[in-house]
């Protein structure tokens, strides 16, 4: 039997998210220092810890060479953190900006969708990348019904930044699904482009939460 080697992991695989993990730790502290109420502290904790978990798990998954079995479990955890981070990013808006039934329903919908996404990847670890990308985009858009109230509360500027972050996440999902562009497969491939777009989107959303949402209460 002829042994066929698997694809070579790019040398920079996971490095961007490793740097982002280290940056997310003081970023969480900054969020907590900006909180004036207990409710804001809860929102900041959920959101900030999700960034730490997202980038930490991703860096661990992609930087370490795992056994096939361990890699499958780490892949499940990596996908789970993506779903959690999407819901957690919406949480400060649901808790601090939106009000009434809309806030409750929107939070329930996005966290319910995140749970569904987690179950999908736990039960179907080999789900096509295109399906995973669609799930992430749909989940990210699940709070779009809150847009009018969001604009009225924080204005068009922060809402535009929020939309920009969503567009960056969507672009990353497209790169992940189609595996293009793939500039230097042995060093910096399509997955690194995806990770870079995720970081850019996360920074954009972080600015909105830290500057406009937490001081809202």
Where are these regions (language model features)?
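Multi-pass alpha-helical transmembrane bundles in non-GPCR membrane proteins
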Residues: 1-217
């Amino acid at each position: 039997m002829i042994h066929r080697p698997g694809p070579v992991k790019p040398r920079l695989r996971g490095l961007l998210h490793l740097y982002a993990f280290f940056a997310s730790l003081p970023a969480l502290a900054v969020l907590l220092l900006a909180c004036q109420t207990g409710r804001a502290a809860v929102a900041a904790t959920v959101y900030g810890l999700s960034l730490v978990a997202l980038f930490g798990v991703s860096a661990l998954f992609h930087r370490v060479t795992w056994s096939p079995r361990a890699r499958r479990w780490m892949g499940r955890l990596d996908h789970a953190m993506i779903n959690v981070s999407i819901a957690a990013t919406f949480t400060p808006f649901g808790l601090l900006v939106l009000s009434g039934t809309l806030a409750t329903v929107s939070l329930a919908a996005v966290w319910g969708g995140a749970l569904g996404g987690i179950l999908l990847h736990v039960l179907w670890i080999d789900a096509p990348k295109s399906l995973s990308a669609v799930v992430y985009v749909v989940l990210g858009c699940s709070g779009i019904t809150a847009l009018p109230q969001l604009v009225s509360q924080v204005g068009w500027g922060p809402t535009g930044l929020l939309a920009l972050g969503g567009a960056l996440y969507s672009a990353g999902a497209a790169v992940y699904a189609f595996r293009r562009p793939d500039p230097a497969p042995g060093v910096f491939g399509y997955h690194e482009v995806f990770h870079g777009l995720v970081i850019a989107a996360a920074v954009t959303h972080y600015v909105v939460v830290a500057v406009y949402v937490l001081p809202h209460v």
